Amino acid sequence: VIIGCPATDTKHTNCIHEDPRVIIGNNNIIREFSLIEQPCYEEKTIVGNDVFLMQGVHISHDVCLQDKVVITNTSVLAGIVKVLEGANIAMACTINQYTVIGQYSIVATNAACMKNVKPFSRYIPGKPLSVNYYAIKKFGFEAYEKEIEEYVLNNQELVSGPLKMIVAEFNFWVVKYGHQTY
């Protein structure tokens, strides 16, 4: 495992941050051959709490992984990616820079993810977004299942308090980084 190596960035090939901070929370599992770069543009590269990085994961500069994120074998996250709470990146995925992966969503195996992924959704290339029922059950959102279905499948606005807060945070990052959403 390599933590805090210089950022790999094509715009600033020798990007050396004056005060490089890689913040790693508690109860994380970081498996062999994984790499976490120091920041280049923002103040920190962050790995939250209860994060599982499987073998050969590449976390580029300025990435933020919130709590309970799972990133599986040989996935690569480009710089300045945000993976929000409870999201799952399946095996051998590549996530484009400035992309936001919403809370409790999953990106399918071998996906090249070029846009943001809505909370509670399953992104499978070439298919319409679907609902991540596994995460709904795992994280205790069963009472909101129908509302989540309408949000993911029909773009209906969420009205329940906890869901509104989740989407508000997702939308904040989407607006900040400007990528389109699947």
Spans of model-derived segments:
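Short, amphipathic C-terminal "tail helix"
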Residues: P162-Y182
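Glycine-rich hexapeptide-repeat left-handed beta-helix
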Residues: V1-I24, I29-N49, Q55-A168
